[in-house]
């Protein structure tokens, strides 16, 4: 199995990213797909694109995908409150999402105080070394949703994580999500105005979390997210 990652940017501003874990015979088509995504993205044409291929040398940890909850009227404040995220922490998370800084990874905040707990600056924390497998093979999820669900499932695979809020920085995509092990994966429609680049990924955690261990899991442990519908 091989890990394949793509990142593209223009003048050091993030444009697009993608990754997966695949068999050797799928490398060529995966690289072509990531190349197309990186170079022909609505956020602009990059002046830098990097594709990294690395053989996986350790066991792959299986993670059960979060359940997708279909609710057109999902309310972010109610969802976060149900998961133990305070209004103060949510407001601080939205401040990071709406500021002009384009973060390439997630920001980790205290679910109580909203204080930032990681120290990775604009880079943030990146959930990497993962793949997504739909064992039902229905093909009923598009690529954007499978990528989001895979990341959300990895991020929430820890008992001290309260939940994750994600808002895409793509210009015309206005649907975000809030996901948590307790309540599943909820899409949030029209969470931002169209034709805006603001966005981000916020992870709300208990203050007692072993941050170094958690970050190592997200960034270094090979993970396979398994999606199964009943």
UniProtKB/Swiss-Prot annotation:
Its cofactor is Mg(2+). Transmembrane segments: none annotated. It catalyses: heptanedioate + ATP + CoA = 6-carboxyhexanoyl-CoA + AMP + diphosphate. Its EC number is 6.2.1.14. It is an enzyme of class 6 (ligase). The keyword DNA repair does not apply. Pathway: Metabolic intermediate metabolism; pimeloyl-CoA biosynthesis; pimeloyl-CoA from pimelate: step 1/1. GO terms for biological process: biotin biosynthetic process. One of its GO terms (molecular function) is 6-carboxyhexanoate-CoA ligase activity. Belongs to the BioW family. Catalyzes the transformation of pimelate into pimeloyl-CoA with concomitant hydrolysis of ATP to AMP. Homodimer. This is 6-carboxyhexanoate--CoA ligase.
């Amino acid at each position: 199995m091989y890990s394949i990652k793509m990142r593209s940017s223009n003048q050091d501003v993030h444009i697009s990213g993608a990754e997966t874990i695949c068999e050797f015979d799928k490398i060529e088509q995966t690289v072509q797909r990531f190349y197309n995504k990186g170079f022909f993205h609505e956020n602009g044409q990059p002046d830098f694109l990097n594709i990294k291929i690395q053989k996986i040398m350790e066991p792959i940890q299986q993670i059960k995908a979060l359940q997708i909850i279909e609710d057109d009227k999902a309310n972010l404040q109610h969802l976060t409150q149900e998961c133990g995220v305070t209004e103060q922490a949510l407001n601080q998370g939205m401040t990071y999402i709406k500021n002009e800084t384009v973060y390439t990874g997630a920001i980790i905040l205290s679910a109580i105080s909203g204080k930032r707990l990681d120290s990775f600056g604009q880079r943030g924390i990146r959930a990497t070394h993962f793949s997504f497998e739909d064992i039902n093979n229905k093909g009923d999820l598009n690529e954007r949703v499978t990528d989001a669900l895979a990341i959300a499932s990895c991020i929430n695979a820890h008992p001290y994580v309260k939940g994750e809020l994600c808002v895409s920085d793509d210009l015309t995509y206005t649907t975000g999500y809030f996901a948590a092990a307790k309540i599943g994966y909820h899409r949030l429609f029209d969470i931002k105005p169209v034709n805006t680049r603001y966005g981000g990924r916020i992870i709300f955690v208990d203050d007692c979390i072993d941050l170094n261990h958690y970050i190592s899991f997200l960034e270094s442990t090979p993970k396979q997210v398994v999606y199964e519908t009943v």
